[in-house]
Amino acid sequence: MMKFILDIVSTPAILVALIAILGLVLQKKKLPDIIKGGIKTFVGFLVVSGGAGIVQNSLNPFGTMFEHAFHLSGVVPNNEAIVAVALTTYGSATAMIMFAGMVFNILIARFTRFKYIFLTGHHTLYMACMIAVILSVAGFTSLPLILLGGLALGIIMSISPAFVQKYMVQLTGNDKVALGHFSSLGYWLSGFTGSLIGDKSKSTEDIKFPKSLAFLRDSTVSITLSMAVIYIIVAIFAGSEYIEKEISSGTSGLVYALQLAGQFAAGVFVILAGVRLILCEIVPAFKGISERLVPNSKPALDCPIVYTYAPNAVLIGFISSFIGGLVSMAIMIASGTVVILPGVVPHFFCGATAGVIGNASGGVRGATIGAFLQGILISFLPVFLMPVLGGLGFQGSTFSDADFGLSGIILGMLNQFGSQAGIVIGLVLILAVMFGVSFIKKPSAKEE
């Protein structure tokens, strides 16, 4: 039974489809409308997941070629890798904390101004796993582990979307949907940077192309060509012989590079199609939940939901974030610290999202500089998170996104300086502050 529940809540397509169905039922929609809304939401999320898989499958070989081409070694942050190891020991605790965290998230949304229902199931699973490991080693077991872990997760699920909601309103033009992706600290940094030094009237989507290059306005074309240049350069440095022998199963290195570039663009195209399908269904369906269960609540959805608003910023953000990762790596090598290699997957998904958010608040400069700083942030946070995880027996692996780093460091410090009491007091104080600010007159999302 527990495995069945874990499978449901960790499968975003099923989880969000059930949420959509619940919303439509609460609105007393007719059965055909409920079935249609649930299925289209389910299929939309599968389309997005499929597109993300295509992108990830095109980026993994790039990372291998990049490391070989430039003779690099170090730690590549990867959520999936560390979670796969941790679940073998902490699987049951993770499942219970995940379920408890979702309940606390709904309760916090119901009784505070943090009206965000976090619906990104795989990120919820990863965060629950990290919390389970840290609290277990701190000495918590059974019910205290589940309740405190669930409370910590519920708090993070509620606060994370709030970090960036101001910029989501600027991006979407309304306050109906939130961003549910545990790298919101980086997105906030990008949006804040854009608002300080950027000019949002000069959008990445208004970049002027000469008439002879007008075809580059098509995002699929521009992404394919840009990525082809990047892939071919790395393939040349890696060497065709190495690629044919180790990666491409005999396909010529340059041909393989072109294939990966096209695969990357295809993945982005599929993601954008899925996002459009989801947003057409989940936002109206969520109205029922907002009206009946959690007044004024907002669905917090995975990061690809923002890509349709600024496709050019997606590519600009990815490249800028990756450059930030390269600069950070050079600093680490020079300073003699542990070296964090720029993981292409987190730099794409987090960098692209930071680019879109930065563009909303500061145009081209916001997208470029904001995503660059976000790339530096997700490079250095793992350096400080690794001692926390290293002491738990996970040397050589770490989480990739900003909120994992921030949350893990805070929980680790509370445990280090106050042991179990420190963690309990810290979580209670954070929850008290959340309730406290909820009694203050609430500003609009644009003012927050």
Q: Over which residues does each language-model region extend?
A:
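Hydrophobic transmembrane alpha-helix bundles
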Residues: 55, 72-73, 88-92, 184-188, ...
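Short juxtamembrane and helix-loop transition motifs at transmembrane-helix boundaries
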Residues: 1-3, 56-61, 76-88, 103-115, ...
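Hydrophobic alpha-helical bundle architecture
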Residues: 110-114, 303-383, 387
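Membrane helical hairpin/interfacial module
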Residues: 44-95
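Membrane-proximal extracellular juxtamembrane segment immediately upstream
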Residues: 51, 55-56, 63, 336-340, ...
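Signature of multi-pass transmembrane helix bundles
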Residues: 1-51, 92, 96, 100, ...
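Mid-membrane cores of alpha-helical transmembrane segments in multi-pass membrane proteins
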Residues: 70-76, 96-102, 122-129, 150-154, ...
